A protein has these predicted regions:
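NTP/phosphate- and nucleic-acid-binding module
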Residues: 2-313
C-alpha cells in the first residue's frame, strides 16, 4: 500500500450513530450494526467499516484541491453482528481488515485509483500464492458505481463464481437473464458443472471472498457535504474504497494449502520456514551442540527457523 502512495492511519473503532444517519446506512445495514448506548444515552456503533468516519475526517481537513489526491488505509478490527457466524475466522462477528479510501477531484482520478488498487491487490494475492479470480460483484450496502471481488477458489467457499477463460467473470448473484442459456443435453446432478453458452464455455466454481474494491463516486461525499474549493466553487469529491479481509486470508490459505498431515502455509505468510526440535538436549551435550550447529547453519543460509529447545518431554 505504501508503494502506491497510500498513507497509513488508525481510525476510531467506536463510531457515533449520527454519522451513519447522514448516509442513511444505519437503516440499510440495520441489525448487522453492533451498537450500544453510552452513559448519556447516545448511540454508537462498533465500526463494521469506515466510509462515514473517513469522510467526516476529510470534510474537516481537506480544504483545497491542492490537498488532493489522497488515499488513506488502516489495518483494524471490525465488528458485524452476523446472523450466522461460522467456519471460525471465515465469517465471524469480529475480524481483522485492511481498508483503504481514496479522494479525488475528478471521476477520472477516482477510476485511475481504482485500477491502481486493483493492481496492488493482485500483487498481494500473487505474492501469497493464491489461485484466485477477480469477478464483478454487487456493491451491496456500501454502494457506488461498480465493484469487483477477489475470490480464492475453494470448494468450501460460500460464493458461486461464473467465468470463462477470456474476458468474463462474475459472482453468480450479479447475473441477469441475458446470461441464461437453454441446456438440452443431460448433465450430472451438480450445480458446479461447466456449461456452454453464448459467452463460450463457462466454469462455475466456489470461492472465498478475500478482497473487494468499489468505485463509490460521490455517494458519501455528497451525502456528508465533502468538497473543496476549486475554480471559485465548491467541488464534491469522488471516492473509492478498497478492502482486504486479513483474517479470512488465513482461512483461505489453509483451504488451498494443506495435506493429510495438516496446514502447509505458503512461504510468504508462514510464521517460519521450518521447526528444529532438540530432544533431551539437557541430558546430552552432543544433541545440544548438534542442534545449535544446525540452527546456526540454517540462520546463516537465510532460513527462518523455529528452534524449540524447551526442557519438556
Amino acid at each position: 500500500m505504501n508503494e502506491y502512495g497510500c498513507l497509513e492511519v488508525l481510525m476510531p473503532m467506536v463510531q457515533p450513530k449520527s454519522l451513519w444517519d447522514e448516509t442513511k446506512r444505519s437503516e440499510q445495514m440495520g441489525p448487522e450494526l453492533l451498537g450500544f448506548l453510552d452513559r448519556n444515552e447516545r448511540e454508537f456503533y462498533l465500526g463494521p467499516t469506515h466510509e462515514e468516519v473517513i469522510t467526516d475526517i476529510c470534510r474537516q481537513e481537506l480544504q483545497s484541491h491542492k490537498d488532493l489526491p489522497k488515499t488513506f488505509y488502516q489495518i483494524q478490527t471490525k465488528f458485524r453482528d452476523e446472523i450466522r457466524p461460522r467456519f471460525g475466522v471465515m465469517r465471524g462477528r469480529e475480524f481483522l481488515m485492511k481498508d483503504a479510501y481514496s479522494f479525488y477531484l475528478e471521476e477520472d482520478g477516482m477510476i485511475k485509483s481504482y485500477q491502481a488498487m486493483k493492481e496492488c491487490y493482485q500483487k498481494i494475492f500473487d505474492e501469497i500464492g493464491f489461485d484466485y479470480k477477480i469477478v464483478k460483484a454487487d456493491s451491496g450496502a456500501i454502494g457506488g458505481n461498480m465493484s469487483e471481488e477477489f475470490h480464492v477458489l475453494a470448494d468450501s467457499g460460500e460464493d458461486t463464481l461464473v467465468f470463462n477463460d477470456k474476458d468474463f467473470s462474475s459472482n453468480i448473484e450479479l447475473l441477469d437473464d441475458s446470461l441464461k442459456t437453454e441446456i438440452e443435453k443431460k448433465i450430472e446432478n451438480n450445480d458446479l458443472s461447466d456449461i456452454d453458452s453464448e459467452h463460450g464455455k463457462l466454469s462455475i466454481k466456489k470461492g472465498i471472498e478475500v478482497g473487494h474494491i468499489f468505485e463509490l463516486g460521490n455517494k458519501y461525499s455528497k451525502a456528508m457535504g465533502l468538497g473543496v474549493q476549486h475554480d471559485n466553487s465548491q467541488k464534491t469529491l469522488e471516492m473509492g474504497c478498497y478492502g482486504i479481509g486479513v483474517s479470512r486470508i488465513v482461512a483461505a490459505a489453509i483451504e488451498q494449502n494443506h495435506d493429510s498431515e495438516g496446514i502447509v502455509f505458503p512461504k510468504n505468510i508462514s510464521a517460519f520456514d521450518c521447526s528444529l526440535i532438540s530432544i533431551n538436549e539437557k541430558k546430552s551435550e552432543i544433541v545440544k551442540k548438534k542442534a545449535k550447529e544446525i540452527y546456526s547453519y540454517l540462520i546463516n543460509n537465510n532460513v527462518d527457523v523455529f528452534y524449540d529447545d524447551r526442557d519438556a518431554s
